[in-house]
Amino acid sequence: TTTAANSFLFMNNCLLHENYAPTAWGTAIHAGNGYVCMNNVTVLGTTATGGNSITVNGDAYFMLANTTIVGNSGNPNGVFRAGGRASTVVNSLFAKGAGSRTIYAGNITSGGYNVYQAADAGWGAVSTDTDYSSQTLPAATLTDGVYQWTVTGTIDEFATKQAVIDAVKSFDATVGQQFINWVGENGFGVDQRGVARNVNKMQAGAYDAGL
């Protein structure tokens, strides 16, 4: 939980697994203020019971790149909500898992190439994003510490490493570049396991099969 305007949370190659919260709002991450930047992060299997629960939630500035949120139940307001400050998502996977909702429409800009299920209408999708609601994804389990899934023909838009980096830069001129420097540009060209991606055809989320 973060509440200070000058707080920064940078995450790279991280797994948040089976978080549980008995009350409302952020089940895995709750950021009321500040900046939250994520690359190659998997959030899997979180459970909540509060009526306003959301897996990753807050009014902070969020930047999600190459990130997977999947298999989350008891979060009636979805798996991701950026309710206050301008936030960006790029090349990320938002799967409903045992829940019924993923992206909560808020102050979100899409950097493109996201794959999502059961998102709110008007959340900010662009032409390179894919609504995957008609497809069945694998059960929410971990293999080699990451959620693995297979791309189908429904998806015909794929990010390049440079497109992801450009989206991170566009998020915030200062903080975006700081995050890139902290991760290193090469960190956007591998998946959460450290396995090289095809930098010209990257799979959405923290896992990449090497398309």
Regions found by a protein language model. Give the residues of each.
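Predominantly extracellular beta-rich ligand-binding scaffolds that present long acidic/polar faces
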Residues: 1-181, 189, 193, 198-201, ...
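Short coil/loop residues immediately preceding or within conserved phosphate-binding loops
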Residues: 184
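Short, structured beta-strand segments at or near domain termini in extracellular proteins/domains
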Residues: 204-205
